[in-house]
Each structure stands twice: as C-alpha cells, then as structure tokens.
Amino acid sequence: MLDETTKNLLIVEVNKLLPENSENKLISAMRYILLAPAKHIRSFLVVASSRVFNAEAKKVISVAAAIEFVHAYSLIHDDLPCMDNSDTRRSQLSCHKKFDEATAVLAGDALLTLAFEVLSSLNEKRCEIIKVLSQAIGIRGMVGGQALDINSEHIDFSPQPSVIQVADTGIQKALPTSISCKKPCNSGAEHEMDSSVSYLHDTLSTLKLQHSYGCMYDAGMTSGQADKIKEIHLMKTAKLFAASCEIGAIIGGATDKQRKALYNYGINLGLIFQAKDDIEDYEQDKTNNLMSMLGKSEVEDYIDGLFKQGLDNLSALSGDTNYLYDLLNQVKKDG
C-alpha cells in the first residue's frame, strides 16, 4: 500500500529504532515480523491522512512506525498456540515457529512497549496521540475484540433451519419465525396472539437453548449473530484503522470535524477489509464468518453500504484525499 518512497522511509525508521543485531534473539524476532513483506495499511493511513493537511511523510514516519510496531505485536500474539495457533504469517513461518513461544511473547511485548516509547518522545500532541491509540487497542478495541473472538469460537454460526433441537432430550419442535394476526382488531385476535406468545414461551422454557446442550440455533437469530461478528470486526481491526487515520489528522492540525470524518472513514475501511477477508477465507474457516451467517450477496451489499459511507466521509474533507480514495477502492476490490 505504501509508495516506494514512504516504504523506504519506514524501513529506514525501523532500522534506526531497532538496529540489526544477529546476536540478540529478541531483536531478531522483532525485526523478523516487521520487515516481512506486508501491505502496511495502518502506517499508510497515518501518512495519507496527514497528507490531507499537507504534512510531509518524513515528519510523521516515526509515528507510522510506532503504529506498525503495535500491529506487528498483535500479529505475533494472535499466532500463538494459545490464541489462533497459526504456523505461518506473511508468507513465512510465524514468529513462535521461527524462534520459540517465549521469544514470540517477549517480542510482542517489546514491540508494544517500543511503540509507546516512540510516541512519548514526540514534541507535540503526544498525549493526545497516545490516548487515541490506547483506546483503539485496549479492552474497548483490539484486545477486547480478540477476547470476543476467542470466546465466540465454540459457537456454530452457520445458518440453521427454523427448528430448535435439543440433543440430550430428543425433543424437537418447529417454531414459527413470525406471528401474524388473521383477525381484525377487537374481534378476539388478542386472545389468539396471547395464545401464540404463550406457546412460544412454553416451548422456549421446555427446550434448553444453549449450545453446550447440543442446540441448533433458530434462523431468526442470525441477525444478532451477524451483529456480534461485526462487533468483533469493529474492535479487532476497524478501530486501529480509524485511530491511524485520526492520528494522521492530529499531526496535520485537523479540526474536530475533520478528525471525525477521517476516523469514520477508517471505521468504514476496516469493516470492508474484514468483510472481504471473510469472503476470501470462507472455505478455509467458517468460524465467526459473516459469509456463514448472511451469504455472499448480503455481505457484498454490506460492503457497498460501507463503501458509500467511506466516500461520504472523504467528501467532507477539502484537502488531498486521493491516496485515501485509492485505498478505499483497492480494499473494496481486493481486500
């Protein structure tokens, strides 16, 4: 995503902040993930957002590097056996496979710490920038989203028929997906409606609607489940995208209105990025996947809506948004 000039500036900054030292296993592990081939979307967003206000890339590159450190830390920890247990990352062995688990944990910790060391050294607006980043990656952001993701993995999010079945009792009843009144008002319809509602309540109390008891979820619940997946996407990914945009805006001296527009653009972009990822990864992993809940057509409609919102947010800015516009199009097309 970064143009070659900015990418080279980022590599120079990484080498300056984290010089190569083949005898230091921890530093080698940190550099291993940082210098692997990657899109660098988050650091790009810092630079591109600051460009809207005519800030030079070389003036924001240390902040962009700090954001990259945070992202790298999250990848290392996500790949650990206690998390996603992934053997590869960025077309190479994941950090704990290349080195070992203990080194991977420490490398992630060190990258996160280094990010805040860099940001605390800024001459201007450092507290504001640190606050925005902290909110995006803490319990209300990336880390909280990872916790939601892990705790949701035991749930089967695939679409189910309008039947609730409890394996341990053998009871099976078909529930109506909606209740419709067939009589005009004041003609006894209230009694029929009450009977229908009573039937549903009796059925729900009889059946044990918990996945641990072998339940199949009613199709009418899919909307709520999809919303939960979107919440995970928002917290794990979109909030750091948005923070990267807002931090670039802060560096550029944006107004509150401009900051909000860029933050919202980042949310739109991050949600598109994750939805596209769900489409591409559907055959490999159906867990916590929007495709499993909504189907491809509805997910694509969701992406189209987010794309339009992203364009609307960019239209509220008067500066050079070409880089951000191109990125929005590219992510919508390719993920």
Model segments located where?
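Short, linear, compositionally biased motifs with a strong N-terminal bias
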Residues: 176, 180-181, 190-191, 198, ...
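Mg2+-dependent prenyl diphosphate-binding active-site environment of isoprenoid biosynthetic enzymes
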Residues: 15-160, 169, 196-276, 282-332
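N-terminal amphipathic/basic leader segments beginning at the initiator methionine
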Residues: 1-18
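Charged/polar low-complexity intrinsically disordered segments
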Residues: 165, 172-173, 182, 192-194, ...
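Intrinsically disordered, low-complexity regions enriched in Ser/Pro/Gly/Gln/His and often acidic
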Residues: 2, 122-123, 174, 178
